[in-house]
């Protein structure tokens, strides 16, 4: 059951190489001190069920959903883009079981503000287990964390916990570029 207005869901399976990107970003986000109205979830492979039941089970209405996943948008491995449900052609966004996630997102978009943050994968294993992200996708995690924080209106510096477990607070790194064109690489 959900108790927050903003939900950040990392989708994917860490057993299949770069498909573990969403859960890896969620792991880093959980190290941060986020506002009480934000819920960070490792949705793993349960994304279809999660999306269908999101509204029905929420005690507090969910107003914003940020989905973090791999997305093959023709970029270079490790490139990151922001998409809206209307940017997805029907059938373009499928989970590991080939379930179409575009349709439930289309249904939810009029009730919830939905953003998909996708990282171009380099390698996704399909028949054998392959633990770990490729170097290019691993390097996209800090930028993605900053993009997520920007998307939910949280300043990065205010989120670092007192133990300093968040490893990449480099002052020279951009906080996530903004864009004017949907689906444009950021």
What is each residue range found by the language model?
Residues 3-8, 14-18, 23-85:
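Nucleotide and nucleotide-moiety/phosphate-recognizing core
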Residues 11-15, 90-91, 130-131:
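A short glycine/serine-rich beta->alpha loop
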Residues 18-20, 28-30, 172, 176, ...:
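Ubiquitous "structural anchor" signal
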Residues 20, 24, 45, 96-99, ...:
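Conserved active-site and cofactor/substrate-binding residues in soluble primary-metabolism enzymes
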Residues 32-35, 64-68, 89-93, 106-108, ...:
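Glycine-rich loops and low-complexity Gly/Arg-rich segments
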Residues 70-114:
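Helix-loop-strand module that forms the ligand-binding subsite of alpha/beta enzymes
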Residues 101-166, 171, 176, 183-186:
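Phosphate-binding/catalytic loops
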């Amino acid at each position: 059951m959900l108790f927050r207005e903003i939900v950040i869901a990392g989708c994917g399976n860490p057993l299949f190489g770069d498909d573990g990107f969403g859960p890896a970003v969620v792991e880093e986000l959980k190290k941060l001190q986020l506002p009480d109205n934000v819920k960070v979830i490792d949705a793993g492979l349960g994304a279809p069920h999660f999306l269908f039941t999101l509204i029905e089970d929420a005690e507090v209405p969910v107003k914003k959903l940020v989905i973090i996943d791999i997305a093959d948008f023709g970029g270079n491995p490790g490139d990151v883009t922001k998409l809206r449900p209307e940017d997805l052609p029907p059938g373009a966004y499928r989970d590991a079981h080939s379930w179409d996630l575009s349709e439930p997102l289309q249904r939810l978009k009029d009730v919830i503000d939905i953003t998909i943050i996708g990282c171009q994968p380099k390698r996704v294993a399909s028949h054998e287990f392959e633990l770990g992200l490729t170097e290019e996708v691993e390097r996209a995690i800090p930028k993605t964390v900053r993009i997520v924080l920007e998307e939910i209106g949280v300043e990065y510096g205010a989120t670092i916990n007192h133990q300093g477990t968040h490893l990449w607070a480099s002052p020279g790194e951009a906080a996530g570029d903004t864009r004017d064109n949907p689906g444009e690489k950021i």
